[in-house]
């Protein structure tokens, strides 16, 4: 009964906080005054018509990355999965993701976002549902690898897609709204996943299987909606007037010309660019931290919270992500307003590293959730300003290739982090030493960010 009361109080607080955040997110999307410049009118329409749709699609995308962490609470025992094996199960997804990432993004740029994003959603939704039918660890390895192949290109594809619509000075905020899907997915998905694990045993089938099957369906639905609703380019958007389409074309054209005047990047030059690989290294270190949180977070909280149910674990994990959602919106707005990226990327990385190092110093559920909150704030606040960096010097096919390279190679941290933590946990019996090591990597990422060259402000046109 106490657990139910705790859950009710936490849930009530999360809802109240969520309403406040929703108000903050929608600032700037309110009813426009009668007299509004074409720029303000166009950006407002894009924020209303493009961002919410791609945001919801990305929430769907992230369910398969968070639900495996929750499924592990009961799946690992049923399939006799060790910590090392679970790290490999989580991480092997990123090998498939890595192999097809760059070709997928180039195909999106060539074929069009509507068709290609719909294809990605439908295929990965089907494969995600298949995960619930595995019976051995090796079958799980295969399906997770196939899931990575199916999903490859989705996140960098959406980032590339947003660069077709938003000028550079608006991109950090647009990217940040997209990556708020990370904490929002956990805020919504963690309690739901916990409830499914505790209560859904239909037809005598294990609850973790239903969790994986049910959370694959939204991707298929999202793929169908994408095919019919998502315009590939501004010229196809029925909600824009002719002068608004022309404003976007002219504004993005000016920015592209400015980049070309500074330096021309072909696709191959982008893939070989030292500046692109500099961003790859930064992202790799931070992805180790991100997937340490998403893969091991449920098991870490469960081990500290004793008799709490899976539903309660889900509610506790929602707290760090709700705090992160609040702060990352502020950080991205500050980055766009100041047109500054380096410190808006480096400081959150330092916060994440500090939290990871300190996690091993306490066994208190309260302080652990507080440190996980600090970690989530650091990781997610990093993402919006970071993803505004590649578009400062890449355009067209070079942007498609460069963004995909950064995301695909950087996301191999999603393999390295969970697998290393699992291997150390299997050998030592705890994960805290491994978490401290990942914290050091976040500090290295922060240092690399500060070594990036300063950029002249983009022209406003």
Segments the model singles out, each with a brief description of its role:
Residues 49-83, 293-298:
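Extracytoplasmic
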Residues 146-180:
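Cytoplasmic helix-loop-helix junction between adjacent transmembrane helices
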Residues 341-386:
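C-terminal transmembrane helical hairpin of 12-TM major facilitator-type secondary transporters
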Residues 100-135:
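Conserved MFS/SLC helix-loop-helix module at the cytosolic interface between two early adjacent transmembrane helices
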Residues 110-121, 336-349:
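Cytoplasmic membrane-interface "Motif A"-like loop-to-helix N-cap segments
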Residues 176-193, 219, 409-416:
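Glycine-rich segments within core transmembrane alpha-helices of 12-TM secondary carriers
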């Amino acid at each position: 009964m106490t657990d139910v009361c705790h859950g009710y109080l936490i849930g009530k607080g999360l809802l109240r906080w969520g309403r406040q955040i929703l108000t903050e997110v929608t600032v700037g999307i309110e009813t426009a005054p009668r007299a509004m410049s074409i720029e303000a009118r166009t950006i407002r329409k894009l924020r209303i018509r493009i961002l919410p749709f791609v945001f919801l699609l990305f929430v769907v995308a992230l369910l398969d990355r968070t639900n495996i962490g929750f499924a592990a609470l009961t799946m690992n025992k049923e399939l006799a999965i060790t910590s090392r094996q679970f790290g490999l199960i989580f991480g092997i997804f990123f090998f498939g993701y890595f192999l097809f990432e760059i070709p997928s993004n180039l195909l999106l740029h060539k074929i069009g976002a509507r068709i290609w994003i719909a294809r990605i959603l439908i295929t990965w939704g089907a494969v995600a549902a298949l995960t619930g039918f595995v019976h051995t660890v090796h079958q799980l390895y295969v399906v997770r690898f196939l899931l990575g192949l199916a999903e490859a290109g989705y996140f960098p594809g959406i980032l590339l897609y947003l660069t077709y619509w938003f000028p550079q000075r608006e991109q950090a905020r647009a990217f940040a709204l997209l990556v708020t899907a990370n904490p929002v997915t956990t805020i919504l998905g963690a309690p739901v996943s916990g409830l499914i694990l505790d209560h859904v045993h239909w037809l005598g089938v294990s609850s973790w299987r239903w969790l994986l099957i049910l959370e694959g369906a939204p991707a298929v639905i999202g793929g169908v909606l994408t095919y019919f609703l998502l315009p590939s380019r501004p010229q196809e958007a029925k909600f824009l007037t002719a002068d608004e389409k022309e404003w976007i074309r002219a504004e993005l054209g000016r920015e592209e010309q400015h980049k070309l005047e500074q330096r021309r990047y072909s696709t191959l030059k982008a893939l070989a660019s030292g500046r692109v690989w500099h961003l790859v290294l930064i992202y790799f270190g931070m992805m180790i931290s991100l997937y340490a949180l998403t893969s091991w977070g449920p098991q870490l909280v469960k081990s500290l919270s004793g008799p709490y149910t899976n539903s309660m674990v889900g509610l506790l994990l929602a707290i760090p992500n709700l705090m992160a959602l609040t702060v990352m919106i502020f950080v991205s707005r500050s980055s766009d307003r100041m047109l500054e990226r380096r410190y808006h990327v480096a400081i959150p990385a330092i916060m994440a590293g500090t939290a990871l190092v300190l996690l091993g110093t306490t066994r208190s559920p309260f302080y652990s959730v507080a440190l996980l909150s600090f970690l989530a704030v650091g990781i997610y606040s990093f993402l919006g300003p970071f993803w505004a960096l590649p578009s400062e010097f890449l355009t067209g096919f070079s942007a498609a290739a460069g963004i995909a390279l950064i995301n695909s190679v950087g996301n191999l941290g999603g393999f390295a982090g969970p697998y290393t933590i699992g291997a150390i946990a299997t050998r030592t019996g705890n994960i805290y030493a491994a978490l401290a090591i990942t914290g050091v990597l976040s500090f290295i990422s922060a240092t690399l960010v500060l070594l990036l060259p300063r950029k002249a402000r983009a022209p406003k046109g």
